Design a protein with these regions (language model features):
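Glycine/serine-rich phosphate-binding loop and adjoining beta1-alpha1 elements at the start
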Residues: 1-94
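Short, well-ordered alpha-helix to beta-strand connector turns
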Residues: 24, 174-175
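Glycine-rich phosphate/diphosphate-binding loop of Rossmann-like nucleotide-binding domains
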Residues: 68-173
Length: 178
C-alpha cells in the first residue's frame, strides 16, 4: 500500500509507474477515487496542514533557540500537538497562512488551537502587534491584475497570464509563512 502520485504524470515518478506496469502490479491511485460529483474521497491534506504547521513552529523554535518540541510523529494526535505548542511562548510574530483548501484549513486548526489572533489583510500589512497574529490569504490577496481591475477567483484561474504576484507586500512584514 502506498500513495503513488502517478496520475498527474510527474516525470520523477515515471520509472515507478513503468516498474508497476512491467510487473503487472494492481495499482489504485487514491487521487482517482471520487464520488458521483468527482470529489476526492481519500485525501491527506488536512493532516498535512496540521503536521506542517506544527513542524513550522518546531523549526522556528529550533532556529531561534527559543524552545524544543518533540517530533510530531512521536505524539498521539492533533490535541497533543496543540497542547505542546501552547506551552511555548512565542514572540510577537506575524504569520501568513496561505490558502483555504484542506492543507490551509488543517494549518488553521493549529493556529486557532494555539489561540493565535487572526487579523485582516489590511491590519496585518499596516499594524504592529504586542502578540503573535496571523492572516489567512487567498490567491487574490497575493496576486493582482496587471490592468488594475479587481475581479474574482474565477477570472484568476481562467486568465492567470493577466496577473502578477503581489506577495512581496507580505514578505516585508511577515516572520513566518505557512
Amino acid at each position: 500500500f502506498f500513495f503513488s502520485h502517478t496520475i498527474k504524470k510527474q516525470p520523477y515518478n515515471r520509472k515507478l509507474l513503468q516498474a508497476i506496469l512491467e510487473k503487472n502490479i494492481e495499482l489504485y491511485d487514491h487521487e482517482t477515487i471520487v464520488d458521483a460529483t468527482n470529489r476526492r474521497l481519500i485525501g491527506f491534506g488536512r493532516y498535512a496542514g496540521i503536521v506542517g504547521a506544527y513542524n513550522g513552529f518546531r523549526a522556528f523554535g529550533i532556529k531561534y533557540d527559543l524552545f524544543t518540541l518533540a517530533k510530531a510523529e512521536t505524539l498521539s494526535g492533533k490535541d497533543e500537538l496543540i497542547t505542546r505548542l501552547k506551552r511555548q511562548t512565542l514572540p510577537n510574530i506575524k504569520i501568513v497562512l496561505s490558502g483555504h483548501g484542506k492543507v490551509g484549513m488543517g494549518a488553521k486548526e493549529i493556529l486557532d488551537g494555539m489561540k493565535i489572533k487572526q487579523v485582516s489583510v489590511t491590519d496585518f500589512l499596516s499594524k504592529k502587534y504586542s502578540e503573535p497574529v496571523y492572516v489567512q490569504i487567498d490567491v487574490l490577496d497575493y496576486n493582482k491584475r496587471i490592468d488594475g481591475q479587481v475581479l474574482n477567483n474565477d477570472d484568476f484561474y481562467k486568465n492567470p497570464q493577466d496577473y502578477i504576484s503581489d506577495f512581496g507586500r507580505f514578505t516585508k512584514v511577515a516572520d513566518v509563512y505557512i
